[in-house]
Amino acid sequence: MNLDSTISFRGATIRIPRQPTPAAPRNATLLPGETLPPVSEPRVKPGERAASRGADSNRSGMRVAKLHSAYGQPVSVREVTTRGERDQFVKFPWRIYAGDKNWAPPLLIEAKAFLDRKKHPFYKHGDAALFLAYVAGEVVGRILVSDDPNYNAQHGTNQGTFGMFESINDQGVASSLLNAAADWLRRRGRNEMVGPIDYSTNYPCGLLVEGFDTPQRVMMNHNPRYYARLLEDWRLTKATDLYAWWLDDSGDMLTRWSKLATRLAQRGSVTVRPVRFADFDAEIARCLKVYNEAWEKSWGFVKMTDAEFLHLARDLKKYAVEDLVLLAEVDGEPAGFCVTLPDFNEATRPLNGRLTTWGLPIGLVKLLRNMRQIKTGRMAVLGVVEKFRRRGVAELFILRSLEHGMLSLGYTGAELGWTLEHNDLINRTIEKVGGKRYKTYRLYSTPI
């Protein structure tokens, strides 16, 4: 008898397999209503030689110097190759962020989909690997390392990236993970490593270094304070900072934005309209052209492929509000693109990663209810094609988004960002009309 069940979420059908429940390991962090399989290192099969004391051989054939944790026990790093290890990789953050009220647990179904080599379009042109760190048989850290040939071709560089870094507060563990990532890239001929970046800067990136006391917003990173020390004590140095800004309904912010946008818009015939969801694929094709042109010269940017952009757009459509996805045209020519998302971390945070419990869509019901109660947003994308800048396009985007979000949807505030630290034009404009820089994220690099 088939015990699987299915649920529908905004047009998507999700199959929920019913599986036996294994026993939980010592010190495991459990999600509500579940137990986890034992966390252990792969055993050495009969006839195989165990790794030497001074080095660790992972299953990709790479030799990594073995370090010790602060407790004097050796750290072992292994590449993820099985479904069980992938589950451990996805669920490990629950150990790091237990008790952190500002962390937003990802939906497990989405976290697994992001790493699916068969379905995520990044793997059509790039490659990546996942690593887990173990001490005394327990998972104590994780890291993603990726190689994007498109980025190197666009910028004339020879780099790879690391991301999804999580570690207990232990330099031996962190260094072991970073060593494994660097060695993986060296084997592919790369000579520089940059991060934290999950595949590319089109996805979550940056290490939080300022602003730990406010909630994690949608599609942004969150991490403990000690991560910066772990990365810097390895040998990573600052490449650039990213700023996140806070806009709220205090004072006369809307009035100031309105005056600025109106004055600048008089310089040209600018039209701002919502993207038509009824003609979604055609509209997304227009937006992709603008997106890639607007950010082409930005630090760290790599053009998204058609498949990547459509994949991401369809994912975000589940949560997006049509009047907050905007396309600008100047004399009929696409000139800019802006996306403000409801901060659905507000809706998902109470679910602790689960849409289902014991096969029942309890989390899904809560999610649909919570989505109607969201009070903040995040302006995640705002780009203007270079020849149309200084015509009020960006200012009109921000004004329209604030007006609809605050006046129509009842939002009390919104995050804008990220922006590059050296983008003086946009940073000064945001400050001038009352925006407050409230978070800073750092990207690091090192020769390898």
Where are the regions a protein language model picked out?
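A conserved beta-strand-loop-helix scaffold within acyl/acetyltransferase catalytic domains
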Residues: P93-A136, I143-A153, P274, D279-L382
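Acyl-donor binding region in acyl/amide transferases
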Residues: N152-R235, T240, N352-V433
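A short beta-loop-alpha structural element at the N-terminal edge
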Residues: S76-Q88, V272-R286
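Flexible loop/turn segments at secondary-structure boundaries
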Residues: R86, P149-N152, T201-Y203, D252, ...
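Generic start-of-chain signal for non-secretory N-termini
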Residues: M1-T21, L31-G33, P37-P42, S52-N102
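Acyl-donor-binding surface of acyltransferase catalytic domains
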Residues: N2-P17, R49-S69, A174-T271, R442-I448
